[in-house]
């Protein structure tokens, strides 16, 4: 068997990791062993945070809807119950957007929710 020299593949592997670590501070950007650990940790954070992002945005939307619904005299839970009874299927993202940027439209939706709760 011929002798396999691995200089080319090792260099390519090192370059790939160091390219991923570009922009890091200190030795994390130019020492392969430390850069490899930093890139691995960054990947773990990215994986975790892609899932947390969904939760955090939902929390934000609910907080905004709750604040706007309370301004119109209805707490969040009763508002959402009223929407369900009125068969209004608008998701939280759109409701939060209306609550922030189109208050009159949101107020109309709250009135419909109130009417369906009273009926």
UniProtKB/Swiss-Prot annotation:
Keywords: Ribonucleoprotein, Ribosomal protein, RNA-binding, rRNA-binding. One of its GO terms (molecular function) is rRNA binding. The keyword RNA-binding applies. Coiled coil: none annotated. InterPro entries: Ribosomal_bL20 (IPR005813), RIBOSOMAL_L20_CS (IPR049946), Ribosomal_protein_bL20_C (IPR035566). GO terms for biological process: ribosomal large subunit assembly; translation. The keyword Lipoprotein does not apply. One of its GO terms (cellular component) is ribonucleoprotein complex. It comes from the Bacteria. PROSITE patterns: RIBOSOMAL_L20. HAMAP family: Ribosomal_bL20. Belongs to the bacterial ribosomal protein bL20 family. NCBIfam families: rplT_bact (TIGR01032). Binds directly to 23S ribosomal RNA and is necessary for the in vitro assembly process of the 50S ribosomal subunit. It is not involved in the protein synthesizing functions of that subunit. This is Large ribosomal subunit protein bL20. It comes from Chromobacterium violaceum (strain ATCC 12472 / DSM 30191 / JCM 1249 / CCUG 213 / NBRC 12614 / NCIMB 9131 / NCTC 9757 / MK).
């Amino acid at each position: 068997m011929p002798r396999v020299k691995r200089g080319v593949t090792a260099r390519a592997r090192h370059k790939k990791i160091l390219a991923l670590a570009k922009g890091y501070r200190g030795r994390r950007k130019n020492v392969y062993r430390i850069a490899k650990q930093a890139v691995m940790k960054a990947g773990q954070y990215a994986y975790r945070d892609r899932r947390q992002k969904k939760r955090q945005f939902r929390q934000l939307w609910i907080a905004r809807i709750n604040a706007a619904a309370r301004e119109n005299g209805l707490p969040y839970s009763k508002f959402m119950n009223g929407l369900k009874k009125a068969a209004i299927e608008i998701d939280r993202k759109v409701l939060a957007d209306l609550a922030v940027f189109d208050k009159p439209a949101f107020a109309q939706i709250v009135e419909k929710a109130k009417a369906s709760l009273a009926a």
